[in-house]
Amino acid sequence: MTEPSSPVLPAPADAAAAEPCPRCGAGLTTDPRFAFWCPTCDWNVGPERPEPTRHERAAAARADRLHRELAAGTSPTARREWLLASAAATLVHLSTAALFLGSLALLVAGNTVQRCLGGVLLVFAVVLRPRFGRVPRGEGVLDREQAPALYGLADRVAAEVGAPRVDLIVLDDDFNASFGVVGLRRRAVLTLGLPLWEALDDQQRIALLGHEFGHRVNGDNRRSFWLGTAISTLATWYDLARPGRLHLGVRTLLVRVGEMIADLLLKALAWLLLQAVQLLDGLTSRAGQQAEYLADSLAARTAGTEAARGLLTTLLLRGSAEVALTRARSGGGRGPRIVRRRGVRSAETARTDAPNPDLLWERMREHLASIPAVERDRLLRWNTLDRTAVDGSHPPTHLRLALLGHGPEQPAAVRTGPEEAAAVAAEIAPHRARIAAALLAG
């Protein structure tokens, strides 16, 4: 057990020689662009974080145990957990169905008071219904006519991993990527964050596609229709049940007492729903993380192990990419942190005096390429030490990298040539300019 890390301190601007570590006396890192820390004892390796909660410690222990089993080749399928999770999901869906059918029965066969109650319950049933996701629309959506080269590359990767062809590709401004099946028709949607796409080389982009399409075939129960909608429904219920602050101006004693009682009831309901969310998370986390490891292996099979490793390493550089984009936005000075938005602003609302978008992406790539090995090592060590960063579907990045290293090096099954890469870049070019302009405008 290591000591809690102190807040990450910036390196002195004139750091020419290594200063001694205040904890162990070894030399600190000296690059003035990054936090200075001690590679010997991990002093200042990351910001100080609160002690992990019981739920976070249990999640970290499950992640470690699954990694050990997969590395040893002895990881049985969690059938018992799947059955329990399916039963819990059935209760969630039955609750929604009972509320809906009960409200209809009151509306059809009840008296006036019962019909009023049925109308209120019907509104609740509609609000609490399962969400199937919506097919995205807007500027970032690319269809096959607009981007034949990108879809052609995506189809080759999907065929390699055994996944159906994607229905829609969406470009947004996040340093991330995702794959989902949405709508009643269950259309496959691939979302590519342009900052991440621009940070990767051609082969790493194929690894990214292989990983995302791997989610279609890796047996992730959390993404199934029955379990996935139950998890999202429970999360919606929890968000709605959390009490907020209601300001009614002048309030009588009776109103204040009523507010206190309602607040206590909502807090109790929210607590129960949170326990249900965490229960489902615990029951499905093993299958979700196992599926994530399988998606990594499919990325390695598609693009080669080296490219898959490079993809995971680049994902650790999200904060550094945000720094580069913020500096470009503010002309080299300090600027606010780039925050993920629900939608990308249109080019018409962006600043007309924004720098050349190509220069923005070039600066980001140059900054990421200039990050020294010791800083990359710090990010990986902090990922190893941060026990609060484990979620139900994504194992820690350091464990994913370690498991890739357990297997043999795989060659790339899919490659892209200069002509295909240039065609894909040309199809994305208008969106590169639009998203860059929106990011620069803040």
PLM region spans:
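Short cytoplasmic-facing helical segments at TM-TM junctions of multi-pass membrane proteins
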Residues: 205-209, 295-296
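Cytosolic-facing loops and C-terminal tails of multi-pass membrane proteins
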Residues: 1-50, 82, 86-88, 254-288, ...
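Hydrophobic or amphipathic, alpha-helical segments that drive membrane association/targeting
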Residues: 1-183, 398, 409-442
